[in-house]
Amino acid sequence: MFEIFKKPLSRIVGATFAFAGVTLLACAMENGVAMAEGPTFQDVASQVFGQPVGPDNDGTLYIFGLTAKYTEPEYVDGRGPYKSFLKMLPSIRWYDPEHYWTNGSQTEGVFKNEECVLCHTVQTPTIVNDWKQSSHGSKDIRRGIGIKKDGKPVEDLVGCADCHGNNHQKLEMPTYKLCNDCHPKETAEHRAGGLGSHTHAYTVNVLEFSWHVGKPAEEVTGCAHCHAIAENRCSGCHTRHKFDPAEARKPTACRVCHMGIDHDEWAMYNTSIHGALYEAESARMDWGKKLKKGNYRVPTCAYCHMQNGDHNPQRFGTIYSDMGMFQVDRGAPKHKAKRDSWIKLCQDCHSPRFAADKLKEMDAGVNLSFTKWREAAAVIVGCYLDGVVDPMPEGSAPDWYGHYTFSLLPGGDPRFYATSNLERLGLEMICYLTGNVYKAYAHMSMYNQTYGNGSAFEQDRKLVEIKTEAAKLRRFAAIEKKIGLEHKSADFWKHGEYLDLLPGWKRKPGDVDVEWFKRTDIPHRANADAGVEIHH
């Protein structure tokens, strides 16, 4: 069965694929789209494997996917300043219902709450059970929780029609705006944040953010959904249809979003003494108690960042530092008021001297971590200035601005894709490592400060990788200069089946909504409007 791997045939296959690669690179390019003048890679793969070329959405099992042709899914138009080329998948309707929700119900009629409950007891029984146990569906537990705008307590049940309407052909998907009718205090707090908060997690940090705008919708949909539900819907933290505050008080509610290589707050908390206490005490704790001093033995995400139930976690932060990628000394005199408030919070369990020492420890560790990053950045920028980066910006696909700007320069777009390996390593160092050094110190994760995820020693490894890559580039450049060879970056850095899908190719004059950046009701990301001058 392994005859296919015999050397003669393997040479034929290799030569055939090599021919395909040369053919593809020789394809004429027009407006960033490959114009196939010869056989495509899929055509050659079809000859090798004996499988016809076909669309990737027809249900066929394609061998290694090599004979499949990409088919764009259904999109909906995006929003924001780049709406002319930003696309979303239809599933965004569940996370940004105010702008995308469409009622798909086939049922007709206007129904009372008890009729909704009767039908959905059969159709969606878990939803009904949750509602009956919630403060919306049980008079016994709801009194005194919901307060109307007029200051009177909500005593009647909050039924299906109160949130979704009673006309089945006009059903609505609620947002925080509807919750505001009964929970004005919590809603006001939720809407009081600045840049980097839940308040603007989607409208600013997705619609203006390069890592979303600059990629095909299919691969960044998770980012859009996570950010959108944080901004637009209250059910991200206390899920429907129970909407239990006890659920939102547990760290696992925060873990859904605040985890992973680029912002690993969960791992930092979970590997700290605080996290160990949570694991030990969680089953015995009364999560129904409010977030007040003395109610909890374990410091949780909500206890520290949502003091007394404040729904603006950012209120207790010192300053937004772009997930820790921007340097700031949080212990500096200008931030004394914030520092004092944190020490006061820590006094629930610790002496003020201990708390102050641990926070100073964080300041020192963070400041040192940026010396490594600057050392790495100097190496990277030096290679760019000497023209030895491969590819140089003009040799790669354009960034989402439609530019060919070096990633670390003003107006540049730091990215993991369609860029040189040297720049990619640099972005990993500042985003995956340096940012998480701060999070490790801030959450008292002693191991991760030094050895673990996003640690000082991981920074060391990345710094060596960056210098090794830079040394190779300089050695190659020296050899090429000595033998008189003028290097040109390979075309695969600029074009490919995936690269040709990138939005940067689609940028054209007049495609930016310049008025968006005149809005004063939202903060704006740095560099969000880069290149507007040449695109309007």
Swiss-Prot record:
Heme c 5 binds at C234, C237, H238, H311. It comes from Kuenenia stuttgartiensis. Catalyzes the oxidation of hydroxylamine to nitric oxide with cytochrome c acting as an electron acceptor. Does not oxidize hydroxylamine to nitrite. Also able to catalyze the four-electron oxidation of hydrazine to N(2) in vitro with reduced efficiency; however, this reaction is probably not physiological. Heme c 8 binds at H274, C346, C349, H350. It is an enzyme of class 1 (oxidoreductase). Heme c 7 binds at C301, C304, H305, H443. This is Hydroxylamine oxidoreductase. It is found in: Anammoxosome. It catalyses: hydroxylamine + 3 Fe(III)-[cytochrome c] = nitric oxide + 3 Fe(II)-[cytochrome c] + 3 H(+). Homotrimer; subunits are linked by two covalent bonds between Tyr-451 of one subunit and heme P460 of an adjacent subunit. Heme c 6 binds at H198, C254, C257, H258. Its EC number is 1.7.2.9. One of its GO terms (biological process) is protein homotrimerization.
